[in-house]
Amino acid sequence: NNREIFVKFINRIFEPYKHELLDTDNDITCDTIGQASGDISLMTHQKIIRDYINLYTPYRGLLLYHGLGSGKTCSSIAIAEGMKNGSKIIIMTPASLKRNYLEEIKKCGDLIYRTNQCWEWISNENNIQIEEALSTALSLPIEYIKRNKGAWLTNITKTNNYHELTTTDKKSLNNQLDEMIQNKYTFINHNGI
């Protein structure tokens, strides 16, 4: 019976989050999450949505219909990040929301796109091997790395230094992240603008 199989599937998805769902002391909203530490992680309902629709489930469509500020953008990013397998991800959004979507990817997307971590500048030193390694690791064109004479790379062994970077460095890093996101995501503006 398909209904019985579906119920078992849903129960299996909810099981890891049972304690989070029953915790009434946890008063986190999309507006307050990450305010103390600057680090953003998915909320429980976003994790459930991410686990419901991914490469390993038979479902390929989902309508997210929540109120304003409930985390729909981060939910859609979590789904997209869970579905990536080397192919481009297509995002359909009004032109007016494209910049917001890019900034949200930097907050709740793949760790490589997040600004709040330790960043170190790696100079290419006109070395083709360094350029190729950076290109592969960051999914950036070699021309981009040559033009900028290097690239930003994360160091997961050190603490967040983003707020210590100069304004010029932050701009350079954000331009690189935008380029990396543009290489992974294709934006289509459904209002034609």
Residue ranges and their predicted role:
Residues 70-160:
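Conserved Walker A/P-loop ATP-binding site and its immediately adjacent core
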Residues 167-171, 180-193:
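Conserved RecA-like ASCE ATPase "motif II neighborhood" in helicase/translocase motors
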